[in-house]
Amino acid sequence: MKVSRVLALVLGAVIPAHAAFSWKNVKLGGGGGFVPGIIFHPKTKGVAYARTDIGGLYRLNADDSWTAVTDGIADNAGWHNWGIDAVALDPQDDQKVYAAVGMYTNSWDPSNGAIIRSSDRGATWSFTNLPFKVGGNMPGRGAGERLAVDPANSNIIYFGARSGNGLWKSTDGGVTFSKVSSFTATGTYIPDPSDSNGYNSDKQGLMWVTFDSTSSTTGGATSRIFVGTADNITASVYVSTNAGSTWSAVPGQPGKYFPHKAKLQPAEKALYLTYSDGTGPYDGTLGSVWRYDIAGGTWKDITPVSGSDLYFGFGGLGLDLQKPGTLVVASLNSWWPDAQLFRSTDSGTTWSPIWAWASYPTETYYYSISTPKAPWIKNNFIDVTSESPSDGLIKRLGWMIESLEIDPTDSNHWLYGTGMTIFGGHDLTNWDTRHNVSIQSLADGIEEFSVQDLASAPGGSELLAAVGDDNGFTFASRNDLGTSPQTVWATPTWATSTSVDYAGNSVKSVVRVGNTAGTQQVAISSDGGATWSIDYAADTSMNGGTVAYSADGDTILWSTASSGVQRSQFQGSFASVSSLPAGAVIASDKKTNSVFYAGSGSTFYVSKDTGSSFTRGPKLGSAGTIRDIAAHPTTAGTLYVSTDVGIFRSTDSGTTFGQVSTALTNTYQIALGVGSGSNWNLYAFGTGPSGARLYASGDSGASWTDIQGSQGFGSIDSTKVAGSGSTAGQVYVGTNGRGVFYAQGTVGGGTGGTSSSTKQSSSSTSSASSSTTLRSSVVSTTRASTVTSSRTSSAAGPTGSGVAGHYAQCGGIGWTGPTQCVAPYVCQKQNDYYYQCV
């Protein structure tokens, strides 16, 4: 890397500078994805965390909103750190929080997982790397918690691993972990052994760890510990009564199902457990709820319903620690007609449902429900007449309810996670007095959307966001970005919209495509995405892919992987474009209606007959893969092409190309947005001197500026980017699990190297014995989770004299300029060749 930088300096290439862009979320609102785990601190009021499967960890605020605390650890290399498979709090220290991070245990995630720890409620994190993978987005992710801190000894932490890796223990507060050789159960259940991609063919492993705080201590550690495993054949619940020295299956335990949750009610000296016939989070057709009397060693089946009323398993389990014997359990999954919640105030002897049949198909609701912080949830998922023509009913209460918690300091405060949001409220005890509670969406601040595409039309809608699971959203102006929309893209409403585009000469004309099989997956808007209509010319066999709209809005080009590239003009029938390969990258010239562009492999294509046919264009240097094409929003014939070797530019509709710079290579999504004056900024995710991240150029790619800073966006090959077509210097980034971010700033010419957050982690060493120890490095290591990271000045400073301004170069090999910074900034080393005033 040093060699390439030296060559760049010798050749006079401009290396990116760092610009101070402050990132925040566009408020889609309401969560937008699965929340498999919620945990309250057992003693301190107001301390709680919610874990997501692809969007990281959040901390609860006093106003019921949430703050993301893992953004700073999810850069391109650490994208999998947004998969949170378990979370634990220290009962003796409300500042400490631990999490198991990693996205997949199959080949989709090449990296092993880690246990991260924070002593400041998630402001900074230290890492201990594990010698195996962690599956925050794998089957069984709603079980838990797999991570637990000994209530009698903060140094002792247990982690139940997946994939047959067993039980792990730390005795130094999470700095190192060793395998517990005395615990031999591994949780051998595999959902689908025939699954060749490994997602459903991995062992589910251990499901939870629960300490019995009422037991005595052995050597300063809690003596009784329960562990649940994914095993419905031999035994699934194990116990140690000597602080983990030996383990045995709990006698008399129920078989047949998998234990999803196990929670202790200390006042009763009882363990409550929910069971389902699958490991979740999508399955569940039978299940049960049990109470284990620890002192008596007896089990009692307290399942709320039986017979034909029992067609689901059980997942979420909340105990009221203020009121012994009071608990709430949730169905997993009652896909029809709705989820069901049950509450008991007598240790499960009797139960009260949250809804019941009046006379079919009418339901009697013992609750009210509202979503004021995310209106689209109520408008599109609750207050609708039909979810599907076959049943006419909707799922108001949610689905995939694996996390359900009652605040241990407040019997009225409860939360539960669904596949879309967090519901809950502050009057739970009304269930007992009036048999009616008020439920709200309480996920404000959680932005877990998987963004599929972004667009911003000059003079049109400020932001069009196509998302997974929740279809998409329109923000008419920049003033709307902080307010959750009233509605998702509706009529038609799909689960996922994969692509959206606008017509350059008619910016209120918008087209989108979806990936739901069996129905038309093209929708058209003539009012900038406020309302939509189905394009009935689309064949119901086609779905997914990307879409491009001609400049005048009369021609749709649709590139799919399974049906090839299709073309429709004047909303007529779609016809195959034989001159393009399936799945080709496509774009329209935004000013010339007859011109479209495409790329596949290393070949660039151009059409001058509204996409009817394409011809091969010039070779783009040594590029082997064309990844994206961005046409200039206001200049005909000007376009940029992103490739595995960098970005190429044409000003003659693709007749000739030139590479804009060699400073940025291996680029992915690119976009143009209004810059300062009459300039347009070019934004690109690619690899530069600061690594793989988001860069911007104010001079058509001649120089580049790092505008990402310490904000994590996940892997750059899955991020989306759109420059604002109307707001100078504003740029949008779509992530796979953290929604849409935006920032605004001035992008000038690059004058030096870029600053980037330094990320360090504990290294792991595995011993040859059966007890594998993971050791941290000698120096304590942390990562900032906030947008602005802490930086430490290097001891080896630059040489020279003078005073440099904010973000200016102040040192480096060969530097002869100023070495002091204007107050209050300090000169910090970014690399051997570049020091910067930050």
Swiss-Prot record:
Q: Report the catalytic activity.
A: Hydrolysis of (1->4)-D-glucosidic linkages in xyloglucans so as to successively remove oligosaccharides from the newly-formed chain end after endo-initiation on a polymer molecule
Q: Where is this region: Disordered?
A: 750-801
GO molecular function terms noted in the UniProt entry: cellulose binding; xyloglucan-specific exo-beta-1,4-glucanase activity
User: Any idea which UniProt keywords this protein has?
Assistant: Carbohydrate metabolism, Cellulose degradation, Glycoprotein, Glycosidase, Hydrolase, Polysaccharide degradation, Signal
Gene3D superfamilies from the UniProt entry: YVTN repeat-like/Quinoprotein amine dehydrogenase
CBM1 domain location, by residue? 802-838
Which of this chain's residues carry glycans? 232, 436
A Pfam family reported for this protein in Swiss-Prot or TrEMBL: CBM_1
What residue range is the signal peptide? 1-19
Per annotation, the relation between temperature and activity is: Has a half life of 15 minutes at 60 degrees Celsius.
| CDD domains the UniProt entry points to | Sialidase_non-viral
Noted pH dependence of activity? Optimum pH is 5.3.
Q: Where is the composition biased (Low complexity)?
A: 754-797
Which biological process annotations from GO are given for this protein? cellulose catabolic process; xyloglucan metabolic process
Q: Please name the top-level EC class of this enzyme.
A: hydrolase
**Residues in the active site?**
53 (nucleophile), 469 (proton donor)
Q: Which family does it belong to?
A: Belongs to the glycosyl hydrolase 74 family.
Q: What does this protein do?
A: Hydrolyzes the glucosidic bonds of unbranched Glc residues in tamarind seed xyloglucan, producing XXXG, XLXG, XXLG and XLLG. Has a low activity against beta-glucan and carboxymethylcellulose. Not active against Avicel, laminarin, xylan, galactomannan, linear and branched arabinans, galactan, polygalacturonic acid, starch, beta-D-Glcp, beta-D-cellobiose, beta-D-Galp, beta-D-Xylp, alpha-D-Xylp, alpha-L-Araf and alpha-L-Arap.
Extract the PANTHER family matched here: OLIGOXYLOGLUCAN-REDUCING END-SPECIFIC XYLOGLUCANASE-RELATED, XYLOGLUCANASE (EUROFUNG)
The name of this protein is Xyloglucanase
Organism of provenance = Hypocrea jecorina (strain QM6a)
